[in-house]
């Protein structure tokens, strides 16, 4: 739980300064940080290859938890030797255990890359310095300024790094906070806070769609929807009902905050309350991928029926339209 989520102990319904600041960022659509675990290295050879990749075979400089800068091919070799030697000595690692956890921290195009790297450095110090070796390398060959952070799984205390979903949420909050300290507008809200119920599609799937290729996952999802429709079992699923209930509560909470802001009588609070109401009004319909497919396939089925089977003068709303 972040400071912005902690209610006022005296007046629990009051919008605290931290909550107000976060509302400003959310309705102002501050850029969302990305903190993602890209993978884990499994052995010394895998680790060496990963370090070669993030350092571009020595063309990029790496920075360690001690602040040491590793330059060029020699720096890359020194880093590889140090980490692989430690891997051999790590007799507590299971044969299928990881050697490192590989993380990427990124911001949208146009973000100051110096601020991004400084924020990642501060994040790494606070999160890992006390218990883990790590190395960070910034990449500037992409429109999104980002830093690769590779952390040794084996901690100084003998415990292994095994981040969970809650850890990633904390890491996002921390990274966003470090960016704000450096003057960069940044937020780390969950998708559901922005009215989204669907997970982001994986990179390879998105790439296939851009090339006009239908991914196997899309084919399978469509086939499942068609089978369910034929069997008469295409109704709402329990998790979809829960998602809608959750979204209703989130939107109600936003409106509660808006009413509380309006009660203060301050012009700035009334202005923010109006923005909050507009934000809620613009939130997307909490539609899952399955529900979207059902709607699209239903529309396509109506379009392909003979003209006499369609009601006259009713007009087509299309797969993306909403009826009143």
Where are these regions (language model features)?
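N-terminal nicking endonuclease/strand-transfer module with a His-rich metal-binding environment
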Residues: 1-324
């Amino acid at each position: 739980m972040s400071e912005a989520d902690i209610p006022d102990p005296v007046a629990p319904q009051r919008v605290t300064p931290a909550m107000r600041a976060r509302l400003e960022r959310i309705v102002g659509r501050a850029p969302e940080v990305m903190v993602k675990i890209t993978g884990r290295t499994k052995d010394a050879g895998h680790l060496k290859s990963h370090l070669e990749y993030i350092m571009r075979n020595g063309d990029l400089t790496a920075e360690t938890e001690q602040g040491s800068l590793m330059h060029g091919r020699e720096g890359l070799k020194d880093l590889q030797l140090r980490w692989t030697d430690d891997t051999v000595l790590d007799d507590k690692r299971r044969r299928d255990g990881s050697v490192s956890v590989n993380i990427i921290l990124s911001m949208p195009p146009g973000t100051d890359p110096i601020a991004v790297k400084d924020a990642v450095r501060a994040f790494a110090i606070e999160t890992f310095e006390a218990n883990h070796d790590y190395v960070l390398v910034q990449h500037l060959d992409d429109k999104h300024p980002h830093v690769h952070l590779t952390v040794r799984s084996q901690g100084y205390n003998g415990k292994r790094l095994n981040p969970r979903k809650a850890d990633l949420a904390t890491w996002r909050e921390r990274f966003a906070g470090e960016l704000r300290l450096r003057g960069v507008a940044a937020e780390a809200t969950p998708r559901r806070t922005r009215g989204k119920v669907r997970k982001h599609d994986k990179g390879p799937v998105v790439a296939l769609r851009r090339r006009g290729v239908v991914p196997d996952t899309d084919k399978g999802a469509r086939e499942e929807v068609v089978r369910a429709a034929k069997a008469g079992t295409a109704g709402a699923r329990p998790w979809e009902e829960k998602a809608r209930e959750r979204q209703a509560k989130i939107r109600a909470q936003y409106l509660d905050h808006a009413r509380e802001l309006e009660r203060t009588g301050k012009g700035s609070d009334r202005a923010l309350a109006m923005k909050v109401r507009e934000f809620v009004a613009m939130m997307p319909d909490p539609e899952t991928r399955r529900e979207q497919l059902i709607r699209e396939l239903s529309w396509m089925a109506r379009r392909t029926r003979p003209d006499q089977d369609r009601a006259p003068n009713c007009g087509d709303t299309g797969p993306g339209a909403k009826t009143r």
